[in-house]
Amino acid sequence: RILEACTLYVLFRDMVSLQRQNFVQNLDCFLLAHLAEDLSIERLTKEFHISKNKLYESCNKYMQNGIAEHIRGLRLAEAKRLLKETTLSVHEISDRVGFNDYNYFCRIFKKYFGTSAGKYRKEQSNYHSNFLAK
């Protein structure tokens, strides 16, 4: 009986781990594909066929922060990538990653990364120039 209980525990634990992995992967895949769009709670609940409570509960359970913070983090990470890898203007990048308010994007970027988006791009450009020159 103890062996049976241990086996069931391991199976259950693995199932929960798989559920978490699937939820986070599916959510992130959808969010990354639609960063520039409105990612309201209503839209996400319709897309994933779950209630608001279940969405909040799942995000709190499987992620380190809430859904709004998670989306913001994905948007900012994509903005950093675009600043590094493209010549799009900061304004274009803010639109492309779903920040409808350019000034808000600039404030939140600086708050998260300690530097402005323009300075970040310049620093990355200087780093790559120095790296290639060596």
Task: Please name every model-derived segment.
Residues 55-59, 104-105, 109:
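Short hydrophobic/aromatic patch on the recognition helix
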